[in-house]
Each structure stands twice: as structure tokens, then as C-alpha cells.
UniProtKB/Swiss-Prot annotation:
Belongs to the vitamin-B12 independent methionine synthase family. GO terms for biological process: methionine biosynthetic process; methylation. It comes from Acidithiobacillus ferrooxidans (strain ATCC 23270 / DSM 14882 / CIP 104768 / NCIMB 8455). InterPro entries: Cbl-indep_Met_Synth_N, Cobalamin-indep_Met_synthase, Met_Synth_C/arc, UROD/MetE-like_sf. It is an enzyme of class 2 (transferase). This is 5-methyltetrahydropteroyltriglutamate--homocysteine methyltransferase. L-methionine binds at I460, G461, S462, E513, D628. The lineage of its organism: Bacteria, Pseudomonadati, Pseudomonadota, Acidithiobacillia, Acidithiobacillales. Its EC number is 2.1.1.14. Pfam families: Meth_synt_1, Meth_synt_2. It catalyses: 5-methyltetrahydropteroyltri-L-glutamate + L-homocysteine = tetrahydropteroyltri-L-glutamate + L-methionine. The gene is metE. Pathway: Amino-acid biosynthesis; L-methionine biosynthesis via de novo pathway; L-methionine from L-homocysteine (MetE route): step 1/1.
Length: 784
């Protein structure tokens, strides 16, 4: 009988219970026992939901208090020495120090999980390191599931993906870090090592890590586990041949008489290039993402082994649109005919990337709601498909008819298409969005206008969102606080932020964005073609959740979105106030995007809307405007052969949004969590006057490419990690800037934090910015 299953379920809870529990624990309002109790309640509820939806197997180990890659590091005992782990079981103090930093040690690096908006904690590897089983978490959770009478399917990050996504570290540099609080070229990665780094190949650690995987599988077998899901999404990347060969040897090594059956799960793109190898592996099944890469199916159906199941992901685990069940069944028919009961049906990937339950959305209009599907509904869709295959389409005729009607409604709705937007797009023609003058002319005009000191200081945009700010916003939404009183409250907060920046001596202040709930949602709420949920939260990292807008139709800007706030802030200071906008690619990447037209077309629609806002800010006297693009790299296709087209339209969308700016208006952009050394030409093609980037966690590693690539414009490398509560010292920030000066001309450097300060407390922000301004003074004295 065809099995239906889930690759993973959201951790956060229907009402963001995990976030509330974590933040209560971090602020010492609850103890570890209470935190673990609340986590267990969430897991119990999520497993029961999946059972109710009809899943034959429920995933175990997909739940994490912070990040599943961090869980894997702890399970394998891969704890960087700087955290003082003495062996045994990894405790929560060590776990959270690795994720968030501590009073004396910075956090581990964090980066995007493939091309999603989820972030994982990057494993650190050093030459000769040992691995050992150091966490009972997975086994404890298997016992929890078994106590419920459910069939557990433990989920592990596979050894190839785990090693590939990590970074090599030089322990000598780490020892220096312990003494000086900064690395000296301590990381090297398979995509090109920093200058001077002492490197080894992390693939050489595979023989050391495999025995721990084997031990885990043996323990699970002893517990009566029949199936284990081992995720190898790295296979969707352009893996070097030696890594592909390592995959084959690794799974041969893990083959044992008494181990559970292994379902090797791939997702996010095609793995057709590895079809022959995957079919030959000693595993009991393979999972394919047919939403991202339906064309790969034929490569697997050809000569698919008779002793393997084939799990096919036909319900989109990364977007919110209701599935076309007829199309899914049509796609599955050849596989079902060939494989019979050996065909399994699942979402394309873990449902980590979609909101929990559409039924919570009681305020969405009926038509739009009928087009949507969240995690619970996606499992229902998987179950319907499974029943259709097992019992025939007649058994689910009513469900199929409802899905068919929703798909037809969405295609024909007049809410989707706006002729005026189409006309503007056609008017662009081949215009690539170039500004009037090249950068050297613009730079001279901007320096004459603003007269900033060497190494000017600024922040990235947001300041702490205090409970008072959130309360005022909530009261305004509920109608308990009038718009006029809400405006007064926000203006008071803006005045406080501007005054504090003046006191600190920040050269280019910002208004702090108290009025913004989220850097994408805020704009989407004011753009036509967008819709919003009340409970559509997804995890970004740790306790940081986002509520992406839904882009369901053509995008346009009916009225100005930020002008009044920026104009008010500028009236409070003689310093140049920086206007703050979110760029078209980031709005696209951090939204749930319509799938009925190319993403490129939607991005250009957003770019034109942002350009309208830039024009109005300039008319209001704002001379420095930041157009954030932190998700620029995130949009890169996983395979390099597909990069060129994406980079071309993504850079063009940014340029079109900024094109209206005259020479003496300075356009900034910001990119956080980005590793973009290999796409610097495309970054330069965006032609922002100033780019600020996240560099402190990677200890300025991102700047290494500037030694060989003569980046033409100005740059602000982040000098402290805002994702950690730790306050960096003046010396630490001076040290980072000294590294920057070695590769970027001093006259082109800015000094700023890594990212916005929204999630931090004032008690952390004020001393950190004081130290940053003092660091700028010291660097100016040396180089200015």
C-alpha cells in the first residue's frame, strides 16, 4: 500500500509557543525543566496532528530548540574548543552559547539553508578532530513518539551534507581568538580559502564521523525503529566529484545487518545527475523533490531497483498555494504504475518553511483563503493523493473537485492582473536601470553635499523594538489606539532614537523604524497585489520568526510608504538622515510569491514600486537612501549553470529601483548573512554608492575577495554581530577595521553593525554603539 509521510513539521507552534518559551528561558523567567516540558508538549501536539492527517510515518528529530544543524553538531560532539566542552552530554548552556554567543565567546557563524530564508549554525571543523555521540535528544524523542503508539521515522542530516555545509577552522587562530577576541584568517572553505589560512580538507573527516552515524543507526535499530530518513540536500548542489564518490563509500560503510531501513532524502533541486549512484546505494529508498524538479523523475524510473521505495514530493513544502491535485496525480501515474506500493507520497521538503495551519486565518477573505495551503493542509493534500492512488480517484472525488475549483478560481480572478502595471513593464523595454553618471562623479557630488568624516559611522536601520512599541502597534491594529495617537507614539520613539544617535556621534543617523513590524511585511501591507496573514509565521533562526506576505497579483504602490516618517526624522537633526527601504529582490525572496508567472517579472513590478518611493523621498529632502537587499544571494539557483540569468535580472531590478536618484543622492544597500565572494561582479553591477555587509561572524572573511577584486564603490563591513547579546570591545572592532583597511582603501570604508538592531535591547545596543563610535575615532586617528 502506498505510504504517505512528512519530511518534517514546523517547530514553532500554532501560537509561537516555542519562541515564547525560549525567550522566557533566556531571560530566566523559566528554568530548563519548564523549557523542556513546553518543548515536549509541542512535539506531542505536532505528532498527533500528523497522525490525524493520515501520515503513516511521523518525523522525529525535526524539532529543535534552535536549529537542526546545531542539533547534529551536538549529537556528533562537534563542539568548538572555545566553548569549553569537557565531554559527556552537551548541555543547554553550551548549546545556546554556540548559537547565540556568551559573555566571553562569540556565536558560531550562521548562514542560509540552501536558497531558503531559514538560517543554520555552520559546523566548525579542525584538523584531527574527533567525533563522539554526545546527545540523547534523538533517542529520547523516539521514546516519546513510541509512547504515543505512533510509527517513528527519525530524521538525520546526512554525513555528506553535514560536512559540506561546515567550515574548516585553524585551531591556532582560535587560540589567538580566545586571547584577543578575534580570528586571524581562521576559516577556510571548500570554495576558496582566505589568504593566509591554514587549511585542510574537511572531507578527510568522513571516516571519523561515520562511526558515530553507525552508532546512532544501531541504537535506533535496538529501539525498534524501522525507517530512518537521512537528508542529503547537498546532492542538489554542484558537488565536486570526490564528494559524490564519498557519498557512495559513506553509505556502503553505514550498511549493517541490524540497522533501520534508510530513506535518503534529497530536495530543493534536481539530483538527476546522481541518479545512477543513488539507485546503486545500499539504502531502502530515495526521496525526490518533484515540485522544484519534476523533470528528474524519468532518470529514476528508468531501471529503478526492485528492492527500493521511491518517495516523491509533489506538494510544495516551500510555498503556500493550494496544490493542483489533478496535476500531481497525473505526474505520479507513471511511477505508480511501475512501482505500486513502493511509491511513497510526501511534501517536496520539510514543512519548516511554511506556516502551521490555515484554519487560524479567520480574517482572510474566502476567495484568497481558498487558494492557500499551510503545513496542516499540505499533509491533508498528501493524504488525499495517497488515497487516490490506493483506493482510486472516486474515493476522493469531492476533495479533488474542491481543489480543482480553487485552481480555476485563482487563474480567472480579476484580482490577479493590473493592465497599468503591465504597461509600465512594457515601457521599460531594454532599459537596464543605469544611473545618470558613473560612480566617481556621483561620489564627488555626494562628498561635496554631506562632508562626512573618514570612516563615517551609521547603523543598518532598525533600533530596538521595545514592548511599548509593540503594544502601541497592537493597540492601533485593534482600534484601541487612534491613528493620531499612534503617530505621536511613533514620533516620540523616533525622536528618542535620533537624539541618542546625536549623543553617540553617529554620522549618518536613521529613524529607527519603530513603525515597522517587519522589513518586508511593512512594505507589502502598503503595496497592491499583496495579502497578509495574522498567524502565517515561519522560522528564520532560533526564536526569530517572520510572517511573509503573500504576493498573489500584480504589484504597484498606491501611496507613499515611508516618506512622512523619514521627513519627520530629518527635521530633528542637521545630520543627513538615511531613508530606509527594502529592495525588490528581498521583498520577493521573503514573500510567498505567486507561481503563475516568472519570478523575474514580479521582481521588476516591485522595483518600479520602490522607484516611486525613492522619487518621493528625494522630493522630501532625503539625500541618503538605503535599499536593503540582504536576500540577494539567497535567490541564487543552487546550480551554477543557472546563476547568470538570475544575477542579470536581480541586479537590474535593484538598479531600476534606484535609477531615479540624482548624482548627489547617495544610494546604500545592505546584505547580511551573505557569502558573495564568488558573485562580486554582479554585486558591483548593482552600482550602489555604499554597500554594508555582514562580516563580523566570519571575522571579515567576506572581504578577502576584495584583495583581488577591485570593488569600485564604498563599503561598510559590519564590525559587530547583532545576533548575539554580547557587547564587543573597542579593541575588537578596531582590529576588524584594521583587517578591512588591508584590502579596501581607507577612504572607501564605513563603520557599522552587521545588521539592524531590532531584536536587541537598549542595554546591549547603547554600549555597543558607544564602542563602535570610539573605534571609529581611533581608526580615523590612525588612518584618517
Amino acid at each position: 500500500m502506498t505510504s504517505v509521510h512528512s519530511l518534517g513539521f514546523p517547530r514553532i507552534g500554532h501560537k509561537r509557543e516555542l519562541k515564547k518559551a525560549l525567550e522566557s528561558f533566556w531571560s530566566r523567567e523559566i528554568d530548563e525543566q519548564e523549557l523542556q516540558s513546553r518543548a515536549a508538549q509541542l512535539r506531542d501536539r505536532h505528532w498527533r496532528i500528523q497522525q490525524t492527517c493520515g501520515m503513516d510515518l511521523v518525523p522525529v528529530g525535526d524539532f529543535s530548540l534552535y536549529d537542526h544543524m546545531l542539533d547534529m553538531s551536538c549529537t556528533l560532539g562537534a563542539i568548538p574548543p572555545r566553548y569549553g566542552f569537557a565531554g559527556g552530554q552537551v548541555g543547554l548552556d553550551t548549546f545556546f552559547a554556540m548559537a547565540r554567543g556568551s559573555a566571553t565567546q562569540p556565536a558560531m557563524e550562521m548562514t542560509k539553508w540552501f536558497d531558503t530564508n531559514y538560517h543554520f549554525i555552520v559546523p566548525e571543523f579542525h584538523e584531527g578532530m574527533d567525533f563522539r555521540l554526545s546527545s540523547e535528544r534523538l533517542f529520547d524523542q523516539v521514546k516519546e513518539v513510541q509512547a504515543l503508539g505512533l510509527k517513528a521515522k527519525p530524521v538525520l542530516v546526512g554525513p555528506i551534507t553535514y560536512l559540506w555545509l561546515g567550515k574548516e577552522k585553524d585551531l591556532n587562530a582560535e587560540a589567538h581568538h580566545d586571547a584577543q577576541h578575534h580570528h586571524d584568517d581562521s576559516a577556510c572553505h571548500g570554495h576558496g580559502a582566505p589568504i593566509g589560512a591554514a587549511c585542510f580538507d574537511r572531507l578527510t573527516l568522513l571516516p571519523k564521523v561515520l562511526p558515530v552515524y553507525a552508532e546512532i543507526l544501531a541504537r535506533l535499530a535496538e529501539m525498534g525503529v524501522e525507517w530512518v530518513q537521512i537528508d542529503e540536500p547537498a546532492l542538489a548542489l554542484d558537488l565536486p566529484q570526490e564528494w559524490v564518490e564519498a557519498l557512495e563509500s559513506a553509505y556502503q560503510t553505514l550498511r549493517r545487518d541490524k540497522t533501520p531501513k534508510v530513506l535518503l532524502a534529497t530536495y530543493f533541486d534536481s539530483v538527476a545527475d546522481h541518479a545512477k549512484a543513488l539507485k546503486a546505494l545500499p539504502v531502502a529508498g530515495v526521496h525526490l523533490d518533484l515540485r522544484r524538479a519534476p523533470q528528474q523523475l524519468n532518470s529514476f524510473l528508468s531501471d529503478y531497483p526492485a528492492d527500493k521505495v521511491l518517495s516523491l514530493g509533489v506538494v510544495d513544502g516551500r510555498n503556500v498555494w493550494r496544490a493542483d491535485l489533478d496535476a500531481a496525480l497525473e505526474l505520479l501515474q507513471p511511477a505508480h504504475k511501475q512501482l505500486g506500493d513502493r511509491l511513497w507520497v510526501a511534501p517536496s521538503c520539510s514543512l519548516l518553511h511554511t506556516p502551521v495551519d490555515l484554519e487560524q486565518e479567520t480574517e482572510l477573505d474566502a476567495e484568497l483563503k481558498s487558494w492557500l495551503s499551510f503545513s496542516v493542509q499540505k499533509l491533508d493534500e498528501v493524504a488525499i493523493i495517497g488515497r487516490a492512488l490506493k483506493e482510486g480517484v472516486e474515493s476522493v472525488a469531492q476533495e479533488l473537485a474542491a481543489a480543482r475549483a480553487a485552481v480555476a478560481s485563482r487563474k480567472s480572478s480579476p484580482r490577479i492582473h493590473n493592465p497599468a502595471v503591465a504597461q509600465r513593464l512594457e515601457g521599460l523595454g531594454q532599459d537596464d536601470g543605469r544611473r545618470k553618471s558613473p560612480f566617481p562623479i556621483r561620489e564627488a557630488a555626494q562628498r561635496a553635499r554631506f562632508k562626512l568624516p573618514a570612516f563615517p559611522t551609521t547603523s543598518i536601520g532598525s533600533f530596538p523594538q521595545t514592548p511599548e512599541i509593540r503594544k502601541a502597534r497592537l493597540q492601533n491594529r485593534k482600534g484601541e489606539l487612534s491613528n493620531a495617537d499612534y503617530q505621536k507614539a511613533m514620533e516620540a520613539e523616533i525622536a528618542l532614537v535620533v537624539k541618542e544617535q546625536e549623543r553617540l556621534g553617529i554620522d549618518v543617523p536613521v529613524h529607527g523604524e519603530p513603525e515597522r513590524n517587519d522589513m518586508v511585511e511593512y512594505f507589502g501591507e502598503q503595496l497592491a497585489g499583496f495579502a497578509f496573514t495574522r498567524h502565517g509565521w515561519v522560522q528564520s533562526y532560533g526564536s526569530r520568526y517572520v510572517k511573509p506576505p503573500l504576493i498573489f497579483g500584480d504589484v504597484s504602490r498606491p501611496t507613499p510608504m515611508t516618506v512622512a516618517w523619514s521627513k519627520y526624522a530629518q527635521s530633528l537633526t542637521q545630520r543627513p538622515m538615511k531613508g530606509m527601504l527594502t529592495g525588490p529582490v528581498t521583498i520577493l525572496q521573503w514573500s510567498f510569491v505567486r507561481d503563475d508567472q516568472p519570478r523575474e517579472r514580479t521582481a521588476l513590478q516591485i522595483a518600479l514600486a520602490i522607484r516611486d518611493e525613492v522619487r518621493d523621498l528625494i522630493d522630501a529632502g532625503i539625500g541618503i537612501i538605503q535599499i536593503d537587499e540582504p536576500a540577494y544571494r539567497e535567490g541564487l539557483p543552487l546550480k551554477r549553470k543557472d546563476w547568470g540569468h538570475y544575477l542579470e535580472w536581480a541586479s537590474r531590478a535593484f538598479r531600476i529601483s534606484a535609477q531615479i536618484a540624482p548624482d548627489d543622492v547617495q544610494i546604500h544597500t545592505h546584505m547580511c548573512y551573505s557569502e558573495f565572494n564568488d558573485i562580486l561582479p554582479a554585486i558591483a553591477a548593482m552600482d550602489a554608492d555604499v554597500i554594508t555587509i555582514e562580516t563580523s561572524r566570519s571575522q571579515m572573511e567576506l572581504l578577502d575577495a576584495f584583495a583581488t577584486f577591485n570593488y569600485p564603490n564604498e563599503i561598510g563591513p559590519g564590525v559587530y554581530d547583532i545576533h548575539s547579546p554580547r557587547v564587543p570591545s573597542v579593541e575588537e572592532m578596531v582590529g576588524l577595521m584594521e583587517k578591512a583597511v588591508k584590502v579596501v582603501p581607507a577612504e572607501r570604508l564605513w563603520i557599522n553593525p552587521d545588521c539592524g538592531l531590532k531584536t536587541r535591547k537598549w542595554a546591549e545596543v547603547t554600549p555597543a554603539l558607544e564602542n563602535m563610535v570610539e573605534a571609529a575615532r581611533q581608526v580615523r586617528a590612525r588612518h584618517g
